[in-house]
Amino acid sequence: MIRPIDRYRKTKKRRLKTSNIHQNDVVSSPICNHLHGHAEIPEELIFSEILTRLPVKTLIKFKLVSKTWNSLISTPLFIKSHLKQTISNPYVPYNCVFIRSPYYFYILNYGAYDRCPNDRSGEKGLMRVNNLNYYDNGVNTFLMGSCNGLVCFGRGGAITGYEYCFYVYNPVMDLIFDVLDPLGNFQWMLMCGFGYVSCKDDYLLLVGGLQKRSSKTFVYVFSLKSKTWRKIRVFDEGELSIFSGGKGVLVNETLHWDLTQVWTPGVKSVCGFDLVDETFKEVEMPRMLLGNRVNLGFKLCDINGCLGGWVVFVDGVVEMWVLKQYGAWDSWMNLFKFDMLPGFRNFCGWTENGKVLLQTDDGSLLLADPKQNPAKYNSLVNYLGDIETVSFVQTAVSPIF
């Protein structure tokens, strides 16, 4: 007679034997062997095809995985690959502006309001940059330009005795590089700009202005790679007849300024500085804007990589022009025109769907659809005061070479 305990032991042994047979069959299966051999993604594929496509904020978290990952993600080769993917990826926040207000720096992803108007989560909203604080309430702070995720701004002016200093900053990575005034004796900053030269793999900072006890305009360029200033040109009084050029508009690796001639204030012209060969050149304006029609002002802007120019006429109509082919000055084309709302100051950005970001005198930012007549406005930010904006893309590019 078999005892119950012996029957249980025999049944358990039989089950274990059957289970081992099935396990061996699974392991020895050619299909399972193939799947098992590809269970882990090659690390090269992870870095070249996966991590390069992630938003930079997510990428920062992956740097904490290990010292090896941190080192590889920080290499110039990976950063360039990530930058290329970021600019070409429509799902990564690209339509952003970096804002200087009287008290703080901000980042606004205005493109999210156009892509997902009913979504109240995600990347929407005004994000304050907490890593930088003003010591003078921003009175003497001015934006100089932005390129590939790096923002260039300066501080100085009459209140500081015209002592200037400049900064190249990645607000997402919280990396900053300080640049001193080339001579320390600028009397007044007339023009400035910031851009990237691909053939030299270098970022250049341009400043031009009057020096103390001199009527000449001096123009200097700073190389972020060599960390040196170079004097580019000295203009005699009246040779570069400008009242104030401000920050240059970067298109085709060339900085552009709309200039007011000193001796004839009503006459406007466009000046370009080629960052590649470091020479000044004249850019022809749209012929339609050179007629007798009275206008209140003409300004330049960047329209998704093309040079744009807009003009406000006395009747309140705004016309936007775009240079379709750079260098072919007869390719200026009228993009749109519509009646502008009171208090309009500047165009700040463009979405993929053709909507424009507008700035008003009180520091409000609105998204407008110029294709509708009258134009439809969507208020994004209200009453920031006296602000400046530059287009901005979130990248892992470092200002420290």
PLM features: what roles do these ranges have?
Residues 1-401:
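N-terminal entry/capping and adjacent linker segments that precede and initiate structured domains
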